[in-house]
């Protein structure tokens, strides 16, 4: 393994090559489609999986086929999933939302950046080689105006973003005609309200009630609108970010593109190393999905990593810097209060959240209340001016199953509920972060506590991991908990990669984490009964029963791995049409036997029916025509 490990220079060169040669790419036998809305510019991208026809009879010389409908699926890849779009990372993506933002007339361009740090970076000629060349002129709300999707929703306004989301959440299921494909088991939604058809008005109503958020900073016009809420599809977040130890700008852009290709609904940039500002600019200008950050990480860098030296002024400057770059949501650890820190003393693993430990250390060293809590209203004012959503961080989340659901965890959660109401006063969108490490029997309480004390604001959890014994497989241990809490009502799940607790994930780790979590959220959507969630499963089952191998590969979340595993034992082209796989072989294939039984039963029914008719014919004397009273 060590013989094939790339050097840092090789890793960067590979990432640079990826970026330089990047082009829109479709999955096997898929094509990009767009569904238009009523608002100008609303063209919702989806991936449509093309399927082969089913053989239904005929002869070898003249076979008869029945067409199978193409299956539309949700697509997070943006322009990177459209082969017709030319990609240029140096220029960034097209500004999809810019006309909608401008048309509202409630923003203004800034002549001077609000952040001292940003102005310093822009004045540094030594950063020219690293800097993204096409910098946007940032906008903010005009004086006295609020520009959040929550504000518009409360005013009764259906924005283009809301219509875009309604179309997207329906996943093109109105295109499906087959009753076999449309069949769906009733879900158990635990109080969630899942309409048969998601309308733009329903989206507006959910956002207005605070049950859902649309992360959409006015300075990130490249992003495609998406929604986070328990009455919608469960979403997945992927974490990327450089560190002081490893990774580079080109590698993080590569991981961003890779993440969106494999289904990340949002991406968090958790960079802690050099060039945080420049890295984030490249990511934002090339991201079709919302970008989140943890601003305290960069604020800490500004004071040389010394938590005690953090100040509100440095943190505020960081918020302005990131808001004007276009960050869509901030994780803020404002619920780590001074009086809660002693509650963690008896824990097995103490405080495991980086942001939580930073704020706990600051509180103890100054013996003062958390300055994020003290200045929370000012944080909300900043967010309202740019439409930055708040992700209220769980700094006291449990880091082991022994510490799950303890006093400190729920004390902080209740405080996050109080902060949610304050944020809503400013029309700021809010979601709540959750654990962590929780055994299966204790997971549901996390959801019920959050709904009750945080007023149904969307829940966003890391897993949770259901056992602590599997380093190297924590994408699996957490995927179990993720599927469960998604079913119970969690709105978004932060992926966990195989490298969790072990190291910084690479591209393959990112893919493994995302596929694991796409499985978890899909299982949750099925269990909740999200309309149309079962269509892809039904299409896969039909293809499997009919031995349409190519369709099985292409319907899979990861077509490449599915094909590779099949071809390990049946690599020949004949294996793609064989009515068996290598598991059972031709004589013991259950589905082949089932088909034979079905054909036999159908033949027997016809034969018995014909025999009955013949006997009836003879009983009536063999007359072709009968008198009316005999018929």
Swiss-Prot record:
EC number: 4.1.99.17
Required co-factors: [4Fe-4S] cluster
Chain positions recorded as [4Fe-4S] cluster binding sites: 581, 584, 589
Binding sites annotated in the UniProt record for substrate: 239, 268, 297, 333, 353-355, 394-397, 433, 460
Record keywords, A-Z: 4Fe-4S, Iron, Iron-sulfur, Lyase, Metal-binding, S-adenosyl-L-methionine, Thiamine biosynthesis, Zinc
Any one of the GO CC terms: cytosol
Cystines in this chain: none
Free-text remark on how the cofactor is bound: Binds 1 [4Fe-4S] cluster per subunit. The cluster is coordinated with 3 cysteines and an exchangeable S-adenosyl-L-methionine.
Molecular function, one GO term: zinc ion binding
Pathway the protein contributes to: Cofactor biosynthesis; thiamine diphosphate biosynthesis
GO BP: any one term: thiamine biosynthetic process
Binding site for Zn(2+): 437, 501
Known catalytic reactions: 5-amino-1-(5-phospho-beta-D-ribosyl)imidazole + S-adenosyl-L-methionine = 4-amino-2-methyl-5-(phosphooxymethyl)pyrimidine + CO + 5'-deoxyadenosine + formate + L-methionine + 3 H(+)
Keyword Signal tagged: no
Keyword ATP-binding: no
Alphabetical list of NCBIfam families matching this protein: PRK09284.1, PRK13352.1, thiC
Functional note: Catalyzes the synthesis of the hydroxymethylpyrimidine phosphate (HMP-P) moiety of thiamine from aminoimidazole ribotide (AIR) in a radical S-adenosyl-L-methionine (SAM)-dependent reaction.
Binding partners and assembly: Homodimer.
Record family assignment: Belongs to the ThiC family.
Name the record gives this protein: Phosphomethylpyrimidine synthase
């Amino acid at each position: 393994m060590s013989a094939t490990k790339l050097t840092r220079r090789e890793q960067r060169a590979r990432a640079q090559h990826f970026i330089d040669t990047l082009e829109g790419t479709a999955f096997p036998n898929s094509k990009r489609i767009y569904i238009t809305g009523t608002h100008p510019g609303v063209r919702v991208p989806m991936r449509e999986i093309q399927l082969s026809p089913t053989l239904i009879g005929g002869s070898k010389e003249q076979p008869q086929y029945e067409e199978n409908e193409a299956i539309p699926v949700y697509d997070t890849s943006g322009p990177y999933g459209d082969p017709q779009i030319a990609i240029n990372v140096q220029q960034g993506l097209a500004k999809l939302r810019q006309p909608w933002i401008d048309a509202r007339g409630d923003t203004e361009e800034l002549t001077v950046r609000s952040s001292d740090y940003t102005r310093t970076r822009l004045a540094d000629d030594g950063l020219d080689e690293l800097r993204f060349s096409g910098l946007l002129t940032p906008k903010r709300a005009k004086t006295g105006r609020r520009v959040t999707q929550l504000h518009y929703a409360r005013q009764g306004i259906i924005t283009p973003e809301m219509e875009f989301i309604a179309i997207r959440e329906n996943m093109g299921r109105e295109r499906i005609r087959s009753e076999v494909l449309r069949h769906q088991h009733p879900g158990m939604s635990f109080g969630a309200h899942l309409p048969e058809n998601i309308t733009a008005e329903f989206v507006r109503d959910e956002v207005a009630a605070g049950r859902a958020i649309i992360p959409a900073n006015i300075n990130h016009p490249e992003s495609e609108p998406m929604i986070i809420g328990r009455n919608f599809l469960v979403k997945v977040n992927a974490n990327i970010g450089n560190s002081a130890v490893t990774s580079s700008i080109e590698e993080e852009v590569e991981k961003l593109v890779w993440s969106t290709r494999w289904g990340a609904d949002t991406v968090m940039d958790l960079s802690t190393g050099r060039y945080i500002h420049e890295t984030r600019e490249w990511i934002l200008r090339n991201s079709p999905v919302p970008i989140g950050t943890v601003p305290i990480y960069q604020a800490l860098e500004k004071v040389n990593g010394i938590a005690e030296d953090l100040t509100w002024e440095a943190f505020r400057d960081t918020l302005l810097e990131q808001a004007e770059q276009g960050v869509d949501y901030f994780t803020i650890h404002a619920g780590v209060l001074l009086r809660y820190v002693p509650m963690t003393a008896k824990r097995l693993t103490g405080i495991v959240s980086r942001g939580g430990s930073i704020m706990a250390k600051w509180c103890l060293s100054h013996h003062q209340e958390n300055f994020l809590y003290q200045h929370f209203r000012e944080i909300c004012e900043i967010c309202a001016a740019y439409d930055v959503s708040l992700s209220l961080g769980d700094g006291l989340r449990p880091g082991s199953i022994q510490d799950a659901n303890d006093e400190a965890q729920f004390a902080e959660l209740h405080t996050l509920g109080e902060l949610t109401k304050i944020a809503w006063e400013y029309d700021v969108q809010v979601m709540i972060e959750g654990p962590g490490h929780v055994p299966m029997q204790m997971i549901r309480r996390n959801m019920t506590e959050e709904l009750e004390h945080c007023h149904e604001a969307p829940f966003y959890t890391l897993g949770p991991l259901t056992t602590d014994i599997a380093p190297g497989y924590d994408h699996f241990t957490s995927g179990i908990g993720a599927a469960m809490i998604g079913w119970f009502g969690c709105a978004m799940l932060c992926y966990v990669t195989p490298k969790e607790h072990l190291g910084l994930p690479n591209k393959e780790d990112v893919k493994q984490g995302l596929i694991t979590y796409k499985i978890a959220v899909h299982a949750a959507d099925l269990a909740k009964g999200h309309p149309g969630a079962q269509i892809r499963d039904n299409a896969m089952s039909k293809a499997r029963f009919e031995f349409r191998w190519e369709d099985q590969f292409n319907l899979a979340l990861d077509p490449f791995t599915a094909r590779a595993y099949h071809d390990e034992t049946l690599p020949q082209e004949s294996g793609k049409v064989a009515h068996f796989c290598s598991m059972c072989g031709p004589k013991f294939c259950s589905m082949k036997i089932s088909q034979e039984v079905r054909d036999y039963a159908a033949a027997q029914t016809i034969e018995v029916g014909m025999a009955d008719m013949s006997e009836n014919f003879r009983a009536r004397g063999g007359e072709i025509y009968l008198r009316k009273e005999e018929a």
